[in-house]
Amino acid sequence: NVIYFTNKCNLACTYCYEDLPGRPPQIMTKQDIRNSVDSVLEREDPNSQTLFCLFGGEPTLEWDNVEYCMLYAYSKKRNVHFNMTTNGIKFLSKKFLKQVMDNPFYKSKLLSIDISFDGVGNQDRIYHDGKASTPSMIKVLKAVASAGLRWRLRYTIQAGNINHWYDDISKLGKTFNPSRIITSVAWTTLEADDDKLKLAQGKDLFRKDWINKAIDVPICELFCDMCSGCGERKELKTYYSDEGNVTTYGNYENSPTFHDFKEKENINE
């Protein structure tokens, strides 16, 4: 149940389909939010948990609307929870980070914050002035990890990083808890047979690394498990723990942070 708050963003990633040049800004009104929430709740089982994905563009740019959506949904149904997909830039603001951390409603209802980060040194993820965002993103990840937020790093494999996605995830897994790294594949950007071959080769490298216990990165068939509408969604997925154990989980929207991995938020400077 995805709520798109805006197509605006504080980054200008070259591969993004939302914030295209000449495309007018689009922002949900309060009425739009109520209509969207009501539409979801009308078709949901009143006795089951309802999950909303807070999305954009960049949803934190419309935080008042995000907050309104969460409170409105909660006023209609107590058994609701949320996850948010964000580039995380706004969490560099200590004031905003504190605002989220100090609110017990957010802490209980915001199950996960998925921070998109598609490459170490990726020049396709830039600010509007052309400046690279990677230095900021490393600070974002350290800030949310230190603050104790429930977060995951969402890496989308696409044409811009297909040549180095394996190296990226390996490096990130050595700095941050690898159980927090999830991956998805933007298949529409990987049209060339060579790109598909590189994807397959990267998967094989990870499997071999696991056999040799050379790295510490979980493998989830390399697909994101967040969106129920995803064409690659499967009922069960296999996760490899940092001890070499294999566990199969049911795949459902907004799956929680993988609980069987060691929590080791060792942030290397």
Segment roles from a protein language model:
Residues R125-N245, Y249, P256, F261-K262:
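Radical SAM enzyme [4Fe-4S]-AdoMet core and its adjacent flexible, acidic
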Residues N1-N35:
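Canonical Radical SAM [4Fe-4S] cluster-binding loop centered on the CxxxCxxC motif
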Residues G56-E58:
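Active-site neighborhood of divalent metal-dependent phosphoester/pyrophosphate hydrolases
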Residues N65, N251-N254:
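Residue-level structural signal for beta-strand termini and adjacent loop
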Residues E269:
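Cysteine/selenocysteine-centered motifs that mediate thiol-based redox chemistry or coordinate metal-sulfur cofactors
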Residues R23, K264-N266:
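Short, contiguous acidic/charged loop-to-helix segments that flank catalytic cores in large enzymes
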Residues R34-C53, E62-T188:
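Radical SAM/AdoMet-radical enzyme domain recognition
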Residues L11-Y15, G121-D124, A192-D193:
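Short acidic/His/Gly/Ser-rich catalytic and metal-binding motifs that mark active-site loops
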